[in-house]
Swiss-Prot record:
Domain of life: Bacteria
Keyword line: Ribonucleoprotein, Ribosomal protein, RNA-binding, rRNA-binding
GO CC list: cytoplasm; ribonucleoprotein complex; ribosome
GO biological process, one term: translation
Matches recorded under InterPro entries: Ribosomal_bS6 (IPR000529), Ribosomal_bS6_sf (IPR035980), Ribosomal_S6_plastid/chlpt (IPR020814), Transl_elong_EF1B/ribsomal_bS6 (IPR014717)
Name of the protein this chain belongs to: Small ribosomal subunit protein bS6
Organism per entry: Lacticaseibacillus paracasei (strain ATCC 334 / BCRC 17002 / CCUG 31169 / CIP 107868 / KCTC 3260 / NRRL B-441)
Summary of the function given for this chain in its UniProt record: Binds together with bS18 to 16S ribosomal RNA.
PANTHER family the UniProt entry points to: MITOCHONDRIAL 28S RIBOSOMAL PROTEIN S6, SMALL RIBOSOMAL SUBUNIT PROTEIN BS6M
Keyword Glycoprotein part of the UniProt annotation: no
GO molecular function: small ribosomal subunit rRNA binding; structural constituent of ribosome
Lineage: Bacteria, Bacillati, Bacillota, Bacilli, Lactobacillales
Amino acid sequence: MAETKYEVTYIIRPDLDDAAKTELVERFDNILKENGANIIDSKDWQKRKLAYEINKYNEGLYHIVNLSAEDDKAINEFDRLGKINNDILRHMIVKRED
């Protein structure tokens, strides 16, 4: 079965300190790896102003993960846990064509 490439972008609360942010990113990278994903790269993008207020925040820290996976198990688990984590304001998962 061929691996599918994905891009995961998520917005982290801006008031999270550096240690907590690093721990959050590592935890979600490990969730992807433990569920069969191969992480190509995981990087901070930048702190950006949001188009609209989310949970009383006007800005957020963007993080991007590029990965490949044979099935959608890792993506589904990330989606499930991303929805219930209060430190992640929003997340988006896109299937890449390249």
